[in-house]
Regions:
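Alpha-solenoid helical repeat scaffolds
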Residues: 97, 117, 160, 217-220
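Extracytoplasmic/secreted proteins, especially bacterial periplasmic and envelope-associated proteins
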Residues: 34-38, 86, 102, 106-109, ...
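Carbohydrate-binding/catalytic loop surfaces
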Residues: 56-76, 125-157, 187-203, 245-267
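Extended ligand-binding clefts on enzyme/binding-domain cores
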Residues: 198-277
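Mid-sequence acidic-hydrophobic segments that form the walls
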Residues: 157-160, 173-184, 213-217, 236-239
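Low-complexity, Ser/Thr/Pro/Gly-enriched N-terminal "stalk/linker" regions
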Residues: 2-129, 164-180, 184-185
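Well-ordered alpha-helical segments within folded domains of soluble proteins
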Residues: 9-20, 79-96, 133-158, 199-216, ...
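Residue-level preference for long, well-ordered alpha-helices that form the structural scaffold
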Residues: 28, 32, 83, 103, ...
Length: 277
């Protein structure tokens, strides 16, 4: 029996077991560049920017006549997931750190592709009532996970390259973040799972950086967006940060009489990235 390849397209990344082969310690810039290039070559290969017929696997190049059979070609990773949103931001940062434009070129090429095909998948969805779930995540986001990380990365490259045709995608994402995401009474981003009015530390990164980056995109409202980003950060930190540990709890339930502190490493990583943003 053929062994199933486990990847982000068929298994949630947070359920995968690590298989570290590298060693920890001081690294030279040359070693870092070598590792970054190794990872970059892999993710570039595993994230094709093509539309295919899901029944035949054949590439579709004329988007104007495609129907519900159309989907993004499946690689190991999804082009519009929150995991890939933070990967896009990492690649932008890699260009800034190394001067190697290939990393940002990758981000721009994937965003140009998504901007080109999104209207056609939207047409299919409106006509047929269904389309590729990976595009529905872009067209009709239902959670910060669907919108925030990719939106923040899009803004970062859009403010540097005005020719990048992602305004419609950015505005659709941000409309959800600003106007449709569930919030506590004081405006803090929240969820209704696993309990009513629950804060997830993850949502610091899934929401706040996009708001902060919008201050660069819409300079007329710069101060409003910066104030909102700071307000969100402080309201999360007030409930989630544990001073004696120097860490954040992963969850906070408004109706709870006590607030246990489970400090998940991955979620604390989201909080630290948010602080950097």
């Amino acid at each position: 029996k053929k062994k199933t390849v486990v990847n982000d397209s068929n298994t949630p990344l947070h359920l995968l077991q690590p298989a570290y082969q590298g060693t920890y310690g001081d690294l030279t810039p040359e070693q870092v560049n070598k590792e970054v290039d190794r990872v970059f070559a892999y993710i570039d290969k595993e994230t094709p920017a093509r539309v295919v017929d899901k029944n035949t696997g054949k590439q579709i190049t004329d988007y104007t006549i495609m129907g519900e059979e159309a989907q993004l070609e499946r690689g190991a990773f999804r082009l519009a997931s929150y995991e890939w949103g933070v990967t896009y931001s990492a690649l932008i940062a890699a260009t800034e750190a190394t001067g190697d434009q290939r990393y940002t070129d990758y981000v721009q090429s994937r965003f140009r592709f998504l901007a080109e095909v999104a209207p056609h998948f939207k047409r299919v969805y409106e006509e047929k009532g269904t389309t590729d779930p990976q595009l529905l995540q872009i067209l009709t986001p239902h959670a910060l996970d669907d919108a925030g990380a990719v939106c923040a990365a899009m803004v970062k490259v859009r403010v540097k390259d005005r020719s990048l045709p992602v305004d419609g995608l950015i505005e659709n994402y941000f409309d959800f973040i600003q106007n449709k995401e569930y919030r506590l009474a004081d405006g803090t981003f929240a969820r209704n799972r696993p309990q009513h009015n629950t804060l997830w530390l993850d949502d610091m990164f899934m929401g706040i950086p996009a708001v902060a980056q919008m201050s660069r995109y819409d300079k007329a409202q710069k101060e409003i967006y910066l104030a909102e980003a700071i307000r969100q950060f402080l309201q999360f930190a007030d409930r989630m940060f544990i001073p004696e540990k120097g860490l954040y709890r992963h969850g906070w339930v408004e109706s709870s009489t006590d607030h246990p502190a489970f400090c998940w490493a991955r979620a604390n990583g989201w909080a630290m990235l948010t602080a950097c943003e």
